[in-house]
Structure formats: structure tokens, C-alpha cells
């Protein structure tokens, strides 16, 4: 397993000793935000077609819950950590839950990793998610205010949408 800053990951400034198939994204408080897998290349899972973050000429757009969280917290999130795990790393970490004679794939191990590490943004397999204590960014505050306003307009008593 290697742990690098998100900037190092984005700029592809790291050396991979093996084929990494699972990633763990942490916030600036060292809390685990998200766990995901890739059958090809983790960098492409983040920044390629249908990735977590869309990369433009002079902008980044979050396309998933974890991508939005990272982009909303730039520039601070450049220093957040991402861990890259190999299949063997995951098997060692989950050894207590596995049959030592079993044959495992990363798709089979991902639920165990999510259940053990309890990331705050994963929904599937996450029966007891952790808490994200990252302070709200200005972008998040503006988005929440706009959503609250839309909710009030639609559902409150004097809404133009009610008959």
C-alpha cells in the first residue's frame, strides 16, 4: 500500500511497485471518505471517462460524491491523502475474515474493506458509515443554501407549487 497526497496522485508523481486495484480517500482530518476499486487503472477511475473528477483546461468538476468533496475543498484537498492498495494488501488486511485457501478478486474484497474501514461517503456495503467532520467549504454552503431555498419553494405552505 502506498499513501500519497492528492496532488501527487493528480500529477501522477508516484511510483507503483505493483498493480493497485483499490483506493482509500482521506480528508484533511485523516478520516476515510471513500473506498473504490478499478480493474484497470486507479488514476483513470478518478480522471478518465466517467471518473470522479472531470478535468478541463482550467477547471475541475466533481462528478461523484467523493469527487465533489475533493473539488469543493480545493486548494486544501491537494494535501489530503489517497492510499493505493494491491490485491495482496487487501487480502492481508482482511485475513481474519477470509478462508486462507480461498481465491479472491478485488470485487470480492471491496465489501470487506468498506465494512472494516467505514468510509463516510460509501453507501453500498456500508452498514455503519463513519462521520465526515470536514468543515463545510464555501461551495458546499452555497449549494446547501440553494437546495434549501428550492425545497422551501416547492414544499412549504405558501409555495407557488401547491394548489
Walk through the language-model features, giving the residues of each.
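Boundary/linker segments flanking structured domains
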Residues: 1-21, 26-33, 38-163
